[in-house]
Amino acid sequence: MKHKKPFIVKTAGGAASQCLGLMAAIRVSKLIDRPFVIRHFPYSTGGYYPLAIGPFLSPEEILESAAPTRGLIPADDLAVGRVIENHPMLRKGFTYEKFLKLIRRLKLETIGKRMRGEWYLNYSISRLNKVSRSIKSISGGYFPFVDENVNKEMHSRFIHANIDSPFATHEDEKGQINVVIHYRIGDKRTTYSHPGIMGDGIVDPNSFKRILQAEGLDKNFKVQVISDEPDVAQALLREVGIEAEKNSEVGDLWKDLYLMSKGNIIICPWSTVSQFALTFLVSSGRKVYYPTATSEGWGGKWQLPGVTNYLATYLPKTHSLYHPN
């Protein structure tokens, strides 16, 4: 009976990152036959990302929705997704958060966490499949994987939350090819002003254009752009000759994901939103393009069969999007 005690799932980052953590939690829960509870760290990535997957959880599955970050006293008026300017990772000198980054760089994090009963997945499908029944907790990096049983439960949780499920099956429009481009802008604007905190560069729209050209699409197709900044994304695509319809409702990730699920061809940037989308797009047989690496050359440790990788180019450091002022 002692192994029926819930194990803790540590999450951080935005809604899509949290969804990847939830999928890992479901997979591990089924594997070791124990329930899970979520402990969310809204400040640990250097930006503010509150718990967003609450609608998909039961009250007993939430252990802590705002776990603290050592050395940080958060302000009351933090904006979601914005850099926390007084975050320990941005301070001069050696801080606890910088110590953790050093441990990761030296590849000692797995050993340290294992000693305290925490199973560090580290973007590894083999580690996801080898979790001990006696673990106290699991932590990321979380990554996309395809498990039909997990997908079915995610679909059920979306339906229970009264949110359109991207895991639902769709019938394609006859004679119509629907291309969806996910164009992440948002926090990528701070790639160079806050290096090491808010991700990597913004994809050059020519990368998307090359894919459309390689597909050899005739006139009977439409392009829809899904973005956290749809006006900017639409303008960037127009600069290279791509006319795209934009999502009408800004800031609703769940609707964006649902729209992505209805595409025939989906072109993604390097983004956790796109990574989460891969879990339902690949399983439904959609053609999905995903970059081989970030602007910094990091290619990740996970591979997902059914994804077509492409070599993305990125907007240069001098581009105005990185310098809004």
What residue spans do the PLM features occupy?
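Short amphipathic alpha-helix
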Residues: G21-V28
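A short beta-strand-loop structural module common to alpha/beta enzyme folds
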Residues: R34-T45
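A short, glycine/small-residue-rich beta-strand->loop->alpha-helix junction that serves as a flexible
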Residues: K10-L20, T190-Y192, M198
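Donor-binding and catalytic core of enzymes assembling or modifying cell-surface/extracellular glycoconjugates
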Residues: A15, L212-P305
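Secretory-pathway luminal glycosyltransferase catalytic domains
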Residues: P50-K219, T313-N325
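Contiguous terminal or domain-adjacent regions
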Residues: S295-N325
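Nucleotide-activated donor-dependent transferases that construct or modify glycoconjugates
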Residues: M1-G13
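Short beta-strand segments
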Residues: I38-H40, V180-R184, V223-S227
